[in-house]
Amino acid sequence: MMQESATETISNSSMNQNGMSTLSSQLDAGSRDGRSSGDTSSEVSTVELLHLQQQQALQAARQLLLQQQTSGLKSPKSSDKQRPLQVPVSVAMMTPQVITPQQMQQILQQQVLSPQQLQALLQQQQAVMLQQQQLQEFYKKQQEQLHLQLLQQQQQQQQQQQQQQQQQQQQQQQQQQQQQQQQQQQQHPGKQAKEQQQQQQQQQLAAQQLVFQQQLLQMQQLQQQQHLLSLQCQGLISIPPGQAALPVQSLPQAGLSPAEIQQLWKEVTGVHSQEDNGIKHGGLDLTTNNSSSTTSSTTSKASPPITHHSIVNGQSSVLNARRDSSSHEETGASHTLYGHGVCKWPGCESICEDFGQFLKHLNNEHALDDRSTAQCRVQMQVVQQLEIQLSKERERLQAMMTHLHMRPSEPKPSPKPLNLVSSVTMSKNMLETSPQSLPQTPTTPTAPVTPITQGPSVITPASVPNVGAIRRRHSDKYNIPMSSEIAPNYEFYKNADVRPPFTYATLIRQAIMESSDRQLTLNEIYSWFTRTFAYFRRNAATWKNAVRHNLSLHKCFVRVENVKGAVWTVDEVEYQKRRSQKITGSPTLVKNIPTSLGYGAALNASLQAALAESSLPLLSNPGLINNASSGLLQAVHEDLNGSLDHIDSNGNSSPGCSPQPHIHSIHVKEEPVIAEDEDCPMSLVTTANHSPELEDDREIEEEPLSEDLE
C-alpha cells in the first residue's frame, strides 16, 4: 500500500509537472499569440492572457479536488491515507509555491516518500521556481515592450500632429500669398490709374509753369517800361520827337534791351551810392539854423538826389556806353548767368570753357522742368527779401540824412506820464543875501538838474495839467486800487521782466484778496508772485526774504493757525489805518524836521532865485509864461505854504535851534505814476524836501526798489 501511494504521488507529481509544462507551453503559446497579437493589434494585452492562464490552472485544480472528494466518499479507508498526499499537490496546483519545511517534516515523519522521491520532488520544485522566474522576467519584458510601444505611438501621434500643423501653416501661407497676388493684381489697374493721374498732373504743372513764365516776362516788361518812364521824367533819357508818339509797349524795342535796362539801373544806383558817399565824407554842418537847410532836407527826403548827366545827341552818355557794351553781348562774350568760365545758375557752378559750351550746358541742364522752375521761385523769394531789406535800409539812410541836414531838434516828451518832483533848496549865495536865516534840513544826495541848451519852449494850456489834479496827487495815489493797474497790464507784467511799481505790502494784500477764501499760505503767496510777475521768477532769495519781512513787520497781516497749517489774512481796518497814516504823514518823520514861522516866505523867495540861477529860461522869462503856467506856480506855492502850516500846527518846530548856512543841491526826480486824466500826460509837482508828505511818498515809492527788506 505504501508503495502504491508513493507511486501515486510520483504520478501526481509527474502529472503536476506535466500540467505545469502544459501550462508553461500554454503560456508560451499565449505569449507568442500575445506577441503576434501585439504586433498585429494592441487590442489584447499580455496581462489579460496571464490572468486567463491562471484562471484555467485554478479551474483544473478545482476539478481534481472534486474528483478526489468523490473518490474519497466511495472508499473512506483509502481517503485517510491519501490526505497527507493531497495537501501538497493541491497547494502546488492552486498556488505554485515551494513546499514549506513543516510539510517536509510531516512527509519525513510519515515516511511516505523515499529520499530519491524527495530529491525528485525538490528538482521538480526547482524547475517550477525557474519557470516562475522565467515567467516573471517575461512579464517584465512584456511590460517594457508595452511601454515602448505606447511611447512610440505617442511620438508618432505627435509627429503626425506636427506634420498636420506644418501642412496647415503651409496651406495658410499659400492662401495668403494667393490673396496678396490677387490684391496686387487688383491694384495694378489702380497703379496704372495713379500713373495716368501723375502724368496729367505733370502736364498741368508744365502748362502752369509756362503761364507763370509768361506772366514773369510780362511783369519784367512792365517794370522796364515803368523804369524807362521814370528815367525819362527825371531827364536821364531823352526820346527823339519822332518816337514820342510811340506806345509804351514799343519802348524796349525802340530804345533798350532788358540787359541794357538792368545795366542802366546798376549804373544809376552806383551814381546814387557815390553821391551818398560824397555826402558822408564831405561832412555836414549840424549847427546851421537857416531855413535853407531844412528845405533841402525835406526835398532830399521826398526824392533821392540824382545827378543829371549831360545829354549828347538826344541820349545820355550812360546809354551810349551801355550800347557800346551791348555789341559785345551780342557776340556772346558775356552773359548774366556766365562769368569767369563758371555757370552762375544758383547751386550749379559748373565749369564751362567757352560761351558755346555754356549755352549747351544751359539748354541741357537748366531746361524747363520742375527743378529749374523751383529754383526760379526760390530766386524770386530771395529777390523779394532783398528788395524788402533794401527798402528798409533806404528808409534808414533817408532818416539819417534828414536828421543830419536838419538842425538839432528838441526831445519829444515820452508817452509815459512822468511826475517831475523838484525838491529845490537854496544855494550859499542866496542864503547870504536872504534877510532871514533858514534852519538846516536833512537832505539826500540826488542828481542835479541838467541845464537845457535848446531854445525856450512855451508852455501851452494843453501841456499843463490841471491844478486840482496836482493838489489831489498825494491823497488820490493811495486810493487807486492795485487791480485797476494790474488788470489791463496783466499780460505785460506776466511776460516782461519789469519791476511792478508797488510795495511788497500792497502786492501781498492783492495776492490774499484775489484768493477765494481770502487767506493764503506762504508758499501760495510765493507762487502768486512768480505767476503774476515775470520779474519775481529770478532772485528768489532776495524778494522772498522781503515778503517774509513785510508779513512780520506790518500789523495788517494776521497769521492764523489752521488745520492745513499757518495761513495769512489781511486786517482791512489796520491796512486802511496804515494808508491814512502815510497820507497825513508819520509823526516820526515830522518830528526831526525843524521849521520856523518865516520859513514859507523865505522859501518862496529862494525858490524863485534858485530857479532863476538853474538855467531855466522858462521861469526867468516872464513873457513866455502864460496864464496856465502862472496858475501852476501859484498852486505850487500854495502847496508849499499848506505843508508848512501843517508842520507848524503839529507843534514840531524847534526855535532854539541855531540857524546854520548849508548848501542845498537842486535835484529832479522822475518817476512813473498813474495818469489820472488822459488829457494830462505830464504832472509837474514842485515841493521842498522838508514836506512830510514828500518824505512819506518817497518812502512808499522807493520801497519797491529796495530788494533787501521791502
Swiss-Prot record:
One of its GO terms (biological process) is vocalization behavior. Residues 1-44, 272-334, 433-460, 644-663, 673-710 are annotated as: Disordered. Residues 383-404 are annotated as: Leucine-zipper. Residues 1-28, 310-319 have a biased composition (Polar residues). It is found in: Nucleus. Residues 694-710 have a biased composition (Acidic residues). Residues 287-300, 433-454 have a biased composition (Low complexity). Its main location: nucleus. Keywords: Coiled coil, DNA-binding, Metal-binding, Nucleus, Repressor, Transcription, Transcription regulation, Zinc, Zinc-finger. A zinc finger (C2H2-type) spans 343-366. The keyword Membrane does not apply. GO terms for cellular component: nucleus. Residues 273-283, 321-332 have a biased composition (Basic and acidic residues). InterPro entries: FH_FOXP1_P2 (IPR047412), Fork_head_dom (IPR001766), FOXP (IPR050998), FOXP-CC (IPR032354), TF_fork_head_CS_2 (IPR030456), WH-like_DNA-bd_sf (IPR036388), WH_DNA-bd_sf (IPR036390). Residues 499-589 bind DNA. Residues 417-421 are annotated as: CTBP1-binding. One of its GO terms (molecular function) is sequence-specific DNA binding. Forms homodimers and heterodimers with FOXP1 and FOXP4. Dimerization is required for DNA-binding. Interacts with CTBP1. Interacts with FOXP1. Interacts with TBR1. Interacts with ZMYM2. Transcriptional repressor that may play a role in the specification and differentiation of lung epithelium. May also play a role in developing neural, gastrointestinal and cardiovascular tissues. Can act with CTBP1 to synergistically repress transcription but CTPBP1 is not essential. Plays a role in synapse formation by regulating SRPX2 levels. This is Forkhead box protein P2. It comes from Rattus norvegicus (Rat). The gene is Foxp2.
